[in-house]
Curated annotation (Swiss-Prot):
Residues 154-205 are annotated as: Domain III. It is found in: Cytoplasm. Residues 65-143 are annotated as: Domain II. This is Holliday junction branch migration complex subunit RuvA. It comes from Afipia carboxidovorans (strain ATCC 49405 / DSM 1227 / KCTC 32145 / OM5) (Oligotropha carboxidovorans). Has three domains with a flexible linker between the domains II and III and assumes an 'L' shape. Domain III is highly mobile and contacts RuvB. GO terms for biological process: DNA recombination; DNA repair. Homotetramer. Forms an RuvA(8)-RuvB(12)-Holliday junction (HJ) complex. HJ DNA is sandwiched between 2 RuvA tetramers; dsDNA enters through RuvA and exits via RuvB. An RuvB hexamer assembles on each DNA strand where it exits the tetramer. Each RuvB hexamer is contacted by two RuvA subunits (via domain III) on 2 adjacent RuvB subunits; this complex drives branch migration. In the full resolvosome a probable DNA-RuvA(4)-RuvB(12)-RuvC(2) complex forms which resolves the HJ. InterPro entries: DNA_helicase_Holl-junc_RuvA_I, Hlx-hairpin-Hlx_DNA-bd_motif, NA-bd_OB-fold, RuvA, RuvA_2-like, RuvA_C, RuvA_C_sf. The lineage of its organism: Bacteria, Pseudomonadati, Pseudomonadota, Alphaproteobacteria, Hyphomicrobiales. Residues 1-64 are annotated as: Domain I.
Amino acid sequence: MIGKLKGVIDSYGEDYVILDVQGVGYLVHCATRTLQALPSSGEAAVLSIETYVREDQIKLFGFRSDIEREWFRLLQTVQGVGAKVALAVLSTLPPSDLANAIALRDKAAVARTPGVGPKVAERIVTELKDKAPAFANVDPAVVHLAGAVDDDRAPRPVKDAISALVNLGYGQPQAAAAIASVARDAGEGAETAQLIRLGLKELAK
C-alpha cells in the first residue's frame, strides 16, 4: 500500500495530477482544492495517499495533509458517499470548514457540494456529528447554540442575529460562532441589533 508520494509534478488532468517519482509517473486523483494548491509542472510536491485496490484496477487518491485524507475516509463511512462524492465534498469545503459545518449541523453548507442532495447532506452531518470535534476546534458553546437554533430553542434575538449575518454574506458556521461568542458576554437580555453589531465586530477581528 502507498501512503505518501514525493516527486515532481509532471502534468495535470481535470481531476488528477501525474506525479513523477524517480522516473515513474503516478496518476493521483485529487480534490479540486488540492489540485489548485499544488505547484506548477516541474516543481516538487508531496501528497498523502489513499490506495484503492479493486479486481480490475488500482486507484490512488492524493491529499495535501493527513487530516484531509482522514476526512476522505470518514466521509465514506456515510451511506451513499463513495470516493467521488467524498472528493467533491472536500473540493467544496476544506477540512476545517467541513468539521465546523458538521459540528454546527449546517446541512446547507454540505449540500452546496455538486452531486450532494439534501438527504445525503443530512446524513453526513448526522452520522458524523460525534466525530467532527476530533478534527475541529469548535467551541462547545457554539455547538450547543447551533443545536438550540436547529431545534428552535434559541432565543429569538439570537436566531434573528444569525440570520442577519448570513444575509450579509457570512457562512452559517461563521455567523453562529460569532453570535454564540458575543451572546455569552451580552447576557440573556441582549437585543437583535446589539448582537448583530457585536457579531460584526467579532467577525472583523
